Amino acid sequence: MSVLESKIHTGSEQFRENTEYHKGLLAELKERSAAARAGGSEKAVALHRSRGKLTARERIDALIDPGSAFLEFSTLAAFDMYGGEVPSAGIVTGIGMVEGIECVIVANDATVKGGTYFPMTVKKHLRAQEIAEQNRLPCIYLVDSGGAHLPSQAGVFPDRDHFGRIFFNQAQMSAKGIPQIAVVMGSCTAGGAYIPAMADETIIVKGNGTIFLAGPPLVKAATGEEVTAEELGGGDVHTRVSGVADHLAEDDAHALELARSIVRNLNRRRHTWLDIVEPVAPLYDPEEIYGVLPKDLRTPFDVREILARMLDGSEFHEFKSRYATTIVCGYGRIHGYPVGIVANNGVLFSESALKAAHFIQMTDQRRIPLLFLQNITGFIVGREYENRGIARDGAKMVMAVANAKVPKFTLVTGGSFGAGNYGMCGRAYSPRMLYMWPNSRISVMGGEQAADVLWTIRQEQMAREAAQAGRNPQEAMPGPAELEEQGRRFKEPVLAMYDREGSPYYSTARLWDDGILDPARSREALALSIAASLNGPLPPQEEGLSYGIFRM
């Protein structure tokens, strides 16, 4: 492979300014992430510990293999939602190595609203299960939850992708041979009782773990029977009498050791279908990415400068390097794993879309994972390009992305706007993981463009209203100065809305992505993501009616 040669001057004033700006964004990300990881209030955490419990993240640390990484999903889920009182949506999810086996871990945080399920909690739990199913990863549920957040019941209970879907997914995954393991470490009430009841194997902690469809207050109200939580659904009852649970643990630490023992006996081996080699560090320091990225998304830069700081040995076998240069395609490795890369380097023209479609088909047939680096304003617009068939050619790229069977991964490094989001494997195209950088923006179009479009429509509406009233539209319109002022006032709230909703924090709060990454650490997160995908089966090659690679 060719070695990418950086043309960035790391001693320049521009590089220094870029670095300072992006490190400021990173500091904000770290501050917000640390606050989310702290969980509930100090009082709630103290009460939790007084019961002999570990926190959700302490439980995960004790469960995974010593010294191994935990790839956490959506740390900032529900950020700035629900009055800021539900950090991480009250649940911690991610991929961790347990006894050498990658597992999806779902841990309720009982220090946050008693571990109850808000709408975003449900969405985050379901997303973790989706990742587990796509990648055939065992699920370990560390249960400590009061069930549905009752005031939010309309957004939690009745619909297809609400609380009940959790149990549906458990049943489906179990039927596919994807292990489901539950560790009941606290309350497990009402519908939540089905998490351990539907697991393949269940552990319950003595004294703290309880499983029941109706707690003592509801039992008393319904039947008049007075019973304690332990008598109704404690560990002794469920391991000795009902058989709902299989193992009784003395405390959290014992329960997590039992969980490790269960994983040890799953009889799972990964049979990789990729050509993996020993990893090599990039020739250029990944920390330099802060200086490579411009402060303004509208400022162009060569995406190869990012690749030089992300790929093993900064090696890159580029495809069609002289053709359709606003899209960069080629092969490289990340921590030894081969990847086919599709990276924006400007607006998408017809030629760019055709080149990408060709490369995506070829990479899919070679069964190499695809990595999309999104920094896209969209497809080119205008009469000339419409006449040349930009919609038809863009559709070819979208078709190739949608039908690629290999694992796909998306990293938004800048803008993610309009149909460009679709062509570059946005959330709707089922990438195994989708991450964003702190400088990224996502919306149907830029705020200024949206404001201009809406203001144009408003002016046309004003002219129609004048005509309908029998007035000359041109004479009825305000003078230039007044019209400009009206336009400014009209556009102001539109610009503010797009600025707020285009933020990566707005996106990650609503799980439009799987987390915001430190640009200099993205290489590690991508490697862990690719590694997890290898637990799944070999991507299929279609039987029957099939075609070779179309040269676009």
What residue spans do the PLM features occupy?
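Ligand-binding clefts of soluble mixed alpha/beta catalytic domains
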Residues: 1-552
